[in-house]
């Protein structure tokens, strides 16, 4: 258990110092290794959090959260910053909200950058330079990131496996179904469940909401081909097509969120 107010670890539900409720998970922070040029996720109470597990050099605090910037977004960032297309192709680029980090150096994008952007010009240049936009260095950085954070990733994997096994133990195997939407989250979930239960023959149900992009349908078919042992079914309600329902009752809105309940 962790108290955010006192920044201490405890076994109690209430902090013995301030009395506030504690959290089950210890917070993490993102450190940066300038030598390896990758972020490292560390628990705030890790005694070795300032040491890079790859090169052993001293790291520094970067942010509380971070995500990788894929080459397509990186190209857009270059254009928004009036840089040469693919100028950052050989750099380690990450982001947290509207702040970007290029080789560990912070670059903030203001709201006015997006408000004044020439979207037609951006679309034209994105199309023009996309063929030269390589994943080569990006993949190298991601491989290095995985290596630097392998202990953290192993911990998360074991935690997820334990959760799945505990939940699955309450049901007969033939009643276990994986809901598959064709997105990254359901792909990761399917992978975790199959590996945790050591059962590649589990039932996967792809819910076609009639709103799917062609690429999603294509990916669902490709997923099915790549997992021949899985029982893969498609659920589609042909009686309620999204756009037809919109004509009858109007589109989903903040005050009437009918989409999820219907599909």
PLM feature segments, named:
Residues 2-43, 50-78, 82, 87-263:
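ATP-dependent adenylation/nucleotidyltransferase module used to activate substrates
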